[in-house]
Amino acid sequence: EKKLNKLLMKAIDEAETNEDKARLLSVCWESGLDFANDFMYFVRYALDDDFIVSMEAFTVAENIEELKEEQLTEAILFIDQNSKSNSVAAEQLKTFIRSKIN
C-alpha cells in the first residue's frame, strides 16, 4: 500500500496539467488508501492556485483518519505561513483541521 501511495504522489507531482493533477488526486481519495502519513502533502496541494486541484486535495485531507495532533498543528502553521491573505480555501482547511484537534 505504501508503494502505491508513493507512486500516486509521484504521478501527481509529475503531472503536466492541473487537470491531470486533479484526476490523480481524486484517485487518492476514491481508492480508500491510507494517506495518514502523507497528510502535509495534501495540505500543500489544498492551497494550490487551481481550484479543482485545491478541492481534490482538500477532499483527500478531509478523508484521512487517525491524524496525530502534531500533524494538525504543523498543518495550521504551514497554512498560516504559506497561504495568500483572505484565502477561502486556507480558512476552510484551517477550520476543518481545528475540528480534528481534541
Q: What residue ranges belong to the model's regions?
A:
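Short inter-helical turns and helix N-cap capping residues of alpha-solenoid HEAT/ARM repeat scaffolds
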Residues: 16-17, 49-50, 86-87
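Preference for long, well-ordered alpha-helical segments
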Residues: 74-95
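Ankyrin-repeat and related helical/solenoid repeat scaffolds used for protein-protein interactions
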Residues: 39-63
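Structural detector for internal amphipathic alpha-helices that build alpha-solenoid repeat scaffolds
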Residues: 1, 10, 21-33, 54-67, ...
